[in-house]
Swiss-Prot record:
EC number(s) stated in the UniProt entry for this protein: 2.3.2.-
Residues modified as Omega-N-methylarginine: R433
Involved in CDK5RAP3-binding: annotated span: 121-250
This protein's name: E3 UFM1-protein ligase 1
Major subcellular location class: endoplasmic reticulum
Length: 793
């Protein structure tokens, strides 16, 4: 009952409150949304929608929840996780991060994560536990463990060294943290190990063998060396090739180097390398700062050795001899080093070229070279005189001598340029602490491969620059002959020096020899001046006139034959008499061009071409046409060219008259008859008889080859009695038979078949007998007629 009344009193109180309460207005959800949007648009309210769109949240609330989440997660949270927890777009999270970092200095953003100082302190405590356990930790391992960048971890842990972390970091390599005990233990091991080393030792091999931490070893080693606790030096820095050189070894090394240099006067770079000195040049320059040294390719030499070489070279130049410096130098020095040393020595002499360098190490004075040239002087005169007698033509002109001089000057110019380049190269490769001037020329034989290499170098420059120019036509001696001659007069000379000296002398010897030949020729032709020359011209004109008239008469005789026979006779005449008269004219002109010919018949077509190349343009045109007409097929063309050539050469040709022609006919017939009397050759008897019978019948001369004899005999058929012609034909048949048997015997060799031997020998004997019997009768056909005609005349 009491409960019921209690309920009644409570309800009465509620009713009373409802009666006195003020009325409140409630807005609908749509109205609320419109009002909030309007406030946001007017920038009177700053709120952010959640991702589901059901709630609004203020930026301050976002920041508060981010701080709360960072605290809940132990001081490290990913911003992606924050976006999922707070349920807003990621851009709003990123916008609030900047405000949080500015307002709270102990919070920082690292790789998309918020990290505060509390987290870093706990991380440092964990690192310290690991460090105390193992003695060292590496930043790289910590980066993998905590998924943080190395620079950030290094900075964070460095700030906590000595406060949270009991250890220190390597100043040279900030990637490792050590404990003091670890460093002290390794320092003791390093000190003990390197104190026991007595020779240069690679640091890298010790690291791999004893398990040292590489960077710690270098730091401790550098500290011990700088403090003087370890006596030695580390060569090569902190590299794989670093070498520790103890002081005891360095002292022994320096003692050996000083002793060797004092005794020998030079230092070889390879020897220093074998001693463990990696940079020999720098070592020598550092150790001998005040000593005058010459640095070569593979060694350096002292001033004493340089002075010794200089004295030997000076003595050779002053005494007019030669010297090879190779025996004066240590055997370990290469030829290249010896050449550099010699070039440096030559700079100490006067700037005028007083010596020539051969084979890189041989210095030859100019006087010695001149003496060698003089050794050939007598031999030159002997050979020149012999040459003038034996050689059918000598074309030693001013142009030849001028060309030799040009080649010599160009060669000298090229040598000077090579010397200049070599001097500059030497100044770059070798150095002397002192002055000097360059003077000597150097002569080298170019080692040319047989195939494949194109001269890419400059020893062939002279030859290539004169490609196409005519070389001297007369040479003195070949190089091997010069070498043999020099070996007889130069004792104990290196073979390579002899070869190079011979090659060097070839051009000046040839030039001198040409001058000697010219001098010999001039002396032999001096007597040909004055009245003698007039007599020579007179004789030439007489001989040319005789041959000219003979050609004219021979031309008349050819016209009795058919065209094909005329062509053969014309060709024979051009190759014989016409060529003789041409050679006479060429020989006459060549005498003015320093040409010597004993027999004009020895002048060939090639020699005529050489003579033409020496003539003046006016004379060359006419003589060239005359030379070319010998290969034509017309006597008239040749006569025309001959007239032009004679006029160009001022040679007067006397044309024959009737009386002169009769004299020539008589003399020609008499000469052939005299030859016919003495000959016993059947073929020649037939040839001479046929030509003489032709002259008797036609009163003209005929110059015919042997192959035209049948045509001459055929022509005589109607010109001589029938019995004489029959005798000629019979004799011709026997001559042909004999020639055929001789040719057949030559073709078969000396061993014909046995069954034919007797028959052939019998035929040959019968033919020979018949020819002998008929020869006198054939001769009488001409000789009897000759006697009667002489009587008539």
């Amino acid at each position: 009952m009491a409960d019921a009344w209690e309920e009644i009193r409570r309800l009465a109180a509620d009713f009373q409150r409802a009666q006195f309460a003020e009325a409140t207005q409630r807005l609908s959800e749509r109205n609320c949304i419109e009002i909030v949007n309007k406030l946001i648009a007017q920038k009177q309210l700053e709120v952010v929608h959640t991702l589901d769109g059901k709630e609004y949240i203020t930026p301050a609330q976002i920041s508060k929840e981010m701080r709360d989440e960072l605290h809940v997660r132990g001081g490290r949270v990913n911003i992606v996780d924050l976006q999922q927890v707070i349920n807003v777009d990621l851009i709003h999270i990123e916008n609030r991060i900047g405000d949080i970092i500015k307002s709270e200095k102990h919070v920082q953003l690292v790789l998309g994560q918020l990290i505060d100082e509390n987290y870093l302190d706990r991380l440092a405590e964990e690192v310290n536990d690991k460090l105390q356990e193992s003695g060292q930790v590496t930043i790289s391992e910590l980066c993998k463990t905590y998924d943080l960048p190395g620079n950030f971890l290094t900075q964070a842990l460095t700030q906590r060294l000595g406060r949270i972390i009991s250890g220190h970091i390597d100043l040279d390599n900030r990637g490792v943290i050590f404990t003091e005990a670890f460093v002290a233990r390794h320092k003791a091991r390093i000190r003990g190990l390197f104190s026991a080393i007595t020779r240069p030792t690679a640091v890298n091999s010790l690291i791999s063998k004893y398990g040292f931490q590489e960077q710690l070893l270098y730091s401790v080693l550098e500290e011990l060396v700088n403090s003087g606790r370890l006596r030695g030096t580390v060569v090569g820095g902190r590299q794989d090739k670093a070498v520790f050189v103890p002081d005891i070894y360095s002292r022994t090394q320096s003692t050996w180097v000083d002793s060797f240099f004092r005794q020998n006067g030079y230092l070889e770079f390879d020897a220093l390398s074998r001693l463990g000195i990696p940079d020999a040049v720098s070592y020598i320059k550092k150790r001998y700062k005040t000593t005058q040294l010459l640095f070569l390719k593979a060694a350096c030499v002292g001033q004493g050795l340089v002075d010794q070489v200089e004295a030997s070279v000076e003595e050779a130049i002053s005494s007019g001899t030669w010297v090879d410096i190779a025996p004066l130098l240590p055997t370990s020095l290469s030829v290249e080093d010896a050449a550099i040393l010699l070039q440096q020595v030559m700079r100490a002499f006067s700037k005028q070229a007083s010596a020539v360098v051969f084979s890189d190490t041989v210095v030859v004075s100019e006087k010695f070279i001149n003496d060698c040239t003089e050794l050939f002087r007598e031999l030159m005169h002997q050979k020149a005189e012999k040459e003038m007698k034996n050689n059918p033509v000598h074309l030693i002109t001013e142009e030849d001598l001028k060309q030799i001089s040009t080649l010599e000057s160009v060669s000298t110019s090229k040598k000077d340029k090579k010397d200049e380049r070599r001097r500059k190269a030497t100044e770059g490769s070798g150095s002397v602490r002192g002055g000097g001037g360059g003077n000597a020329r150097e002569y080298k034989i170019r080692k040319v491969k047989k195939k494949g290499r194109k001269d890419d170098d400059s020893d062939d420059e002279t030859q290539s620059s004169h490609t196409g120019k005519k070389k001297p036509e007369i040479s003195f001696m070949f190089q091997d002959e010069i070498e043999d001659f020099l070996r007889k007069h130069i004792q104990d000379a290196p073979e390579e020096f002899i070869s190079e000296l011979a090659e060097y002398l070839i051009k000046p010897l040839n030039k001198t020899y040409l001058e000697v030949v010219r001098s010999v020729f001039m002396s032999s032709t001096t007597s040909a001046s004055g009245t003698g020359r007039k007599r020579t011209i007179k004789d030439l004109q007489e001989e040319v006139s005789n041959l000219y008239n003979n050609i004219r008469l021979f031309e008349k005789g050819m016209k009795f034959f058919a065209d094909d026979t005329q062509a053969a006779l014309t060709k024979h005449l051009l190759k014989s008499v016409c060529t003789d008269i041409t050679n006479l004219i060429f020989n006459f002109l060549a005498s003015d061009l320093m040409m010597a010919v004993d027999d004009p018949a020895a002048i060939t077509s090639e020699i005529r071409k050489k003579i033409l190349s020496k003539l003046s343009e006016e004379t060359k045109v006419a003589l060239t046409k005359l030379h070319n007409s010998l290969n034509e097929k017309s006597i008239e063309d040749f006569i025309s060219c001959l007239d032009s050539a004679a006029e160009a050469c001022d040679i007067m040709v006397k044309r024959g008259d009737k009386k002169r022609e009769r004299q020539i006919l008589f003399q020609h017939r008499q000469a052939l008859a005299e030859q016919l009397k003495v000959t016993e050759d059947p073929a020649l008897i037939l040839h001479l008889t046929s030509v003489l019978l032709f002259q008797f019948s036609t009163h003209t001369m005929l110059h015919a080859p042997g192959r035209c004899v049948p045509q001459i005999i055929a022509f005589l058929n109607s010109k001589i009695p029938e019995d004489q012609h029959a005798l000629l034909v019979k004799y011709q048949g026997l001559v042909v038979k004999q020639l055929v048997s001789q040719n057949k015997k030559t073709g078969q060799g000396d061993y014909p078949l046995n069954n034919e031997l007797g028959k052939e020998q019998e035929d040959v004997a019968n033919t020979r007998k018949e020819l002998q019997e008929l020869s006198s009768s054939i001769k009488d056909l001409v000789l009897k007629s000759r006697k009667s005609s002489v009587t008539e005349e």
